[in-house]
Structure formats: structure tokens, C-alpha cells
Regions:
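N-terminal Rossmann-like NAD(P)+-binding subdomain of aldehyde/semialdehyde dehydrogenases
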Residues: 1-125
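Conserved small-residue-rich beta-alpha loop and adjacent elements
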Residues: 109-174
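Conserved NAD(P)+-binding/catalytic subdomain of aldehyde/semialdehyde dehydrogenases
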Residues: 180-267
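A glycine- and small/hydrophobic-rich beta-loop-beta segment
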Residues: 262, 270-283
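Conserved small/polar residues in nucleotide/adenosyl-binding loops
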Residues: 281-287, 304
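Hydrophobic alpha-helical segments, chiefly the membrane-spanning helices
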Residues: 291-304
Length: 304
């Protein structure tokens, strides 16, 4: 963790360097993703399976082994604890209640000329949800993307999520079942985005792709936009916290780590108005970081 003061001689230059926008697209990344998409478009399931074996070291021999739906998906609900199920259920209820307030009804009017004008709001038929599954897994992403779609009336939600070495996270798939996901395919990366956008023998194409992912996923979403809709192109996580002495430093440290843990490119910045605030936060961060490293061992090498 870097720490510097306004009294430092190079303070302004260091702040500018720290907060500078990311550079333009990496041409090697763009080319690699383009090639992956082209392979999936032309060879379908076979390309998807080969990329999954190569990048995720998944032992599957057919795409059908990567698909969970119906009773096979619901079975994961029994693999989580009572406390985990209660937490997912409560979060789902709160998310659903919020998004129900956003529903836009159809309306129509007849103007002075007798013309009928109006708006009809129709849900998409099929939406694809990308859920990260590399360095960490996020059941929250499942809930926050699936539930709005279901509230809107989307008939079919398919979720893709990488499972390195074939290790499925029961909590993520249980969240998918409880949220109403219709099908889960345990593939990830640009190849998963390509499969959602163009379809394969086993995966029907979707109308829109949502959800966060790494830079390969973000670039793939950028390249398939136009063929399908996307929510946005998410960059590395960033957070900027102002510690003005009115907030518990423990919460500041937790907020910083909540974004820094996403990946090694994440950026967490804290501006403190007093030495006391920054000193306490500086002491708390390593403790929280150690807890995070216990939960995510691979995180140690990238963030310490």
C-alpha cells in the first residue's frame, strides 16, 4: 500500500500518476479476443470446449457436462448451509422489492385528432448473465443481475461462470437456482461471451449480455455489441474514499478492501484530512487484508 502526504515534494505528480486514466485498448488483447470469438462462431461447441479445457483446465469431454438446469441446478440448494440460504433469500427479497418499483407500465392516450399514441413495454425473451469465477466467486452478482430480469418478465435467463479445474462453487449455483436462473453453463472468458452472442449447438443466442468479468470478458462484450445488447463495459474496480474524521476507520478499510480484492488491477484510493484517520486506517487495512488472503490464497501474491 502506498502512503504519501500533501507536504511531500512530488505529491501532485504522484496523485496524478495514481489516478491517471488507463491506457488505450491493448492491441494484443483485442486480437486475441477477436480470434476466440471467430473460433466459437465457426466451430461452436467444439471450440467452446477446447477453450474451456485450455484456459480453465476443465476435464469435461462434452459441453453437456458443463450445463446445469432443472433438478440438477436445484440440487445445489441442499449443498449450502441454513445460514447461507437465509442470507441469499433475504438479499433476493430486498433486491426484488426494489426493482418492482421500477416496473414501467404500458400506457396510451388519444389526442385531439383521434390518434392513439402510447408505449408498450415488452421484456426481452432471453438474457445472458456472466458471473466471475476466477479469483473469487460472487453470488451477489447472480442475484443483482438475475432478479431485475425476472421482475421485468424475461422468460429465459442463462448464466455462464468459469469453474477452474471443474470446481463448482455450490453457493453461486444455489444462488442461481434461488434467483430463478433457467440454465447455468460453467464456461467463462471471451469464449463464453461469444457463445451467448452467437449461439452454439448447445447454447442458444441471447438478446442481451450483462454482468462483470475480467478484461477479456469486457473486450468480448465490446466486440459483440451490436449483435447483442450489453449493459456496459466494466473496467477494473475503482473506489475513492474521503476520510474526514466523521467515519469509523474500520469501515473505510473495509470499503477499500471490498474493491481491491476484485483483482490485481483494482484501484483503491483514500484521501484523509487528518493524520489520525489515515494512521488508523493504515493499521486496519493489513488486518483485513490478512483475512482476505485466508479466504483467497491466490490473492496474497498480487496484493501484498
Amino acid at each position: 500500500m502506498q502512503r504519501f502526504s500533501q507536504s511531500d515534494g512530488e505529491f501532485e505528480a504522484r496523485v496524478c500518476a495514481l489516478t491517471a486514466p488507463m491506457e488505450a485498448l491493448d492491441p494484443n488483447l483485442v486480437s486475441s479476443v477477436r480470434d476466440i470469438i471467430a473460433e466459437v462462431r465457426s466451430r461452436g461447441d467444439q471450440a467452446l470446449l477446447e477453450f474451456t479445457q485450455r484456459f480453465d483446465q476443465h476435464p469435461a469431454e462434452s459441453v453437456s457436462e458443463l450445463v446445469f438446469e432443472g433438478d440438477a441446478l436445484k440440487a445445489f440448494e441442499s449443498q449450502i448451509t441454513v445460514a447461507e440460504r437465509a442470507a441469499i433469500t433475504e438479499a433476493a427479497q430486498r433486491i426484488r422489492r426494489y426493482h418492482e418499483e421500477q416496473i414501467t407500465p404500458d400506457w396510451s392516450i388519444t389526442d385531439e385528432h383521434g390518434s392513439q399514441l402510447g408505449q408498450r413495454v415488452s421484456p426481452m425473451q432471453r438474457v445472458g448473465l456472466y458471473v466471475p469465477g476466477g479469483k473469487a466467486s460472487y453470488p451477489s452478482s447472480v442475484l443483482m443481475n438475475t432478479i431485475p430480469a425476472k421482475v421485468a418478465g424475461v422468460a429465459d435467463v442463462v448464466m455462464v461462470a468459469p469453474t477452474p479445474s471443474g470446481q463448482v462453487n455450490p453457493l453461486v449455483l444455489a444462488a442461481a437456482s434461488l434467483a430463478g436462473v433457467d440454465q447455468v453453463v460453467t464456461v467463462g472468458g471471451a469464449q463464453a461471451v461469444a457463445a451467448l452472442a452467437y449461439g452454439t449447438e448447445s447454447i442458444r443466442a441471447v438478446d442481451k449480455i450483462v454482468g462483470p468479468g475480467n478484461r477479456y470478458v469486457a473486450e468480448a462484450k465490446r466486440q459483440v455489441f451490436g449483435k447483442v445488447g450489453i449493459d456496459m463495459i466494466a473496467g477494473p474496480s475503482e473506489i475513492f474514499v474521503i476520510a474526514d474524521g466523521t467515519v469509523d476507520p474500520d469501515w473505510i478499510a473495509l470499503d477499500l478492501m471490498s474493491q481491491a480484492e476484485h483483482d490485481e488491477m483494482a484501484q483503491a484510493v483514500c484521501i484523509a484530512t487528518s493524520e489520525d484517520s489515515v494512521s488508523y486506517t493504515h493499521l486496519t487495512l493489513p488486518l483485513i487484508g490478512q483475512l482476505l488472503i485466508l479466504a483467497l490464497p491466490d490473492f496474497a501474491e498480487t496484493r501484498q
